[in-house]
Amino acid sequence: MQNQRIRIRLKGFDHRLIDQSTAEIVETAKRTGAQVRGPIPLPTRKERYTILISPHVNKDARDQYELRTHKRLVDIVEPTEKTVDALMRLDLAAGVDVQISLG
């Protein structure tokens, strides 16, 4: 696994879960002897929705909702076999989407 890099992207709606999962990944990678870069916070995507409250009249009566998607990036430089094994066995929170790419 020399001269390789593992890039892990985490996405989720709750930033506390993402930070907790990122800390677990970083701690696991450092414990197995890999060099870690990150966690790097990426821009938060904010989706705003405006909904009419009234079914017929009162155009001014509206509710506004916002959905925030938080993202983090972790690079693992020079991973060892033990690092890959430990990351495969790692159990993360259910509200976190994990994308792993080798580069």
UniProtKB/Swiss-Prot annotation:
What Gene Ontology terms describe where this protein resides (cellular component)?
ribonucleoprotein complex; ribosome
Q: Which residues form a coiled coil?
A: none
Q: Which PROSITE patterns does this UniProt record tie to the protein?
A: RIBOSOMAL_S10 (PS00361)
Instruction: Tell me which UniProt keywords the record has, alphabetically.
Output: Ribonucleoprotein, Ribosomal protein
- InterPro entries referenced in this protein's UniProt entry, alphabetically: Ribosomal_uS10, Ribosomal_uS10_CS, Ribosomal_uS10_dom, Ribosomal_uS10_dom_sf
Name a biological process GO annotation.
translation
Q: Which family does it belong to?
A: Belongs to the universal ribosomal protein uS10 family.
Name by which UniProt lists this protein: Small ribosomal subunit protein uS10
